Amino acid sequence: TFDYDTIFTSKTIEALLALLMHSGVDAIAPLQTKREANAVMFALPGVTPEQQTTVDEDWFKKPVQRVATAHFGCTFLRCAALKKTPKPWFLAKANEQGEFTGGHVDEDIAFWRAWESAGNTLGIATHVSVGHAELMITWPSRTTEGGKIQQHTTEYWNSGQQAPEGAWGFVA
């Protein structure tokens, strides 16, 4: 699977396919950081996606580590394993209040749970990473040194459509 906002090269593809062929896992994903966050998108087995986890430096000594979930930005799946995975593949589940505002299961997590329940495995390529493109708003700065101020789009929408402090001439 490939996402439009994932940045990689042909060498990335070669490395992931070689690891998939020789690691014994049914799917493999590279390390990828979540947009606007300081977190790599995967969950260790037995850890819920909401929990923050850290790994020791030794964890990266193996070229592939088993994980429970990963991001789909540049992920390879074995077709035979996909055929074993029960459908529907991408079905989100609301929380107990019937909402999707926390405590729910997103489509990708539901897929990986179904993947695992079918007896399939997922690995993270610990030495292969991909970029995650972010859309930023660039504002003219009040200072001549910087020339610009950047703001994440979600910060703009969550702040009531306000420009960041130091932006020049924004009329709200």
Regions found by a protein language model. Name each.
Residues K84-A172:
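C-terminal catalytic/acceptor-binding lobe
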